Regions:
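Short, strongly hydrophobic alpha-helical membrane anchors
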Residues: 1-9
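N-terminal signal-anchor transmembrane alpha helix
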Residues: 9-35
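Nucleotide and nucleotide-moiety/phosphate-recognizing core
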Residues: 10, 14-15, 60-63, 71-110
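Short conserved micro-motifs on helix faces and helix-strand junctions that flank
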Residues: 19-20, 65, 112
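A generic alpha-helix surface/boundary motif
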Residues: 24, 45-46, 72-73
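C-terminal ends of transmembrane helices
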Residues: 27-30, 103-115
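Cytosolic, membrane-interface loops and tails of multi-pass inner-membrane proteins
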Residues: 28-61, 115
Length: 115
């Protein structure tokens, strides 16, 4: 693969992987798996850490927070290193993958684009 194809592949992979990873909502998943309820129908209706902690409490809420942070941090770290290696643009890789992680968090494809 030539250098230009590698760069384009890396850009597409960063966008898709960051978006899809950040679109996973652990509060929704954990509320359904562990409590057999949908957090979006309880409390404030917000499917996030604060509502999860308010409704269910416990240590599991802190796991939700940790996974919420990691779902964006891991792709940003991985792709910033890959961008550094292939294009010498570490900061661009972090910002680029971070942007798509924000989009995935706010408009997740897994939940009909409702974050």
């Amino acid at each position: 693969m030539d250098e230009q194809a590698i760069k384009i592949t890396l850009l597409l992979a960063a966008a898709v992987c960051s978006y899809l990873a950040a679109g996973v909502n652990y509060a929704v998943i954990f509320s359904k798996v562990f409590y057999h309820q949908d957090i979006r129908t309880l409390g404030s209706g917000n499917p996030g850490f604060t509502n999860f902690k308010r409704v269910f409490g416990g240590k599991l809420a802190w796991v939700v927070l940790l996974l919420d942070l990691l779902k964006a941090a891991i792709p940003v770290i991985i792709f910033s290193m890959l961008f550094e290696h292939f294009m010498l643009l570490r900061q661009f890789g972090a910002v680029y993958s971070g942007f798509f992680a924000m989009l995935g968090h706010a408009y997740p494809i897994w939940y009909d684009f409702k974050g």
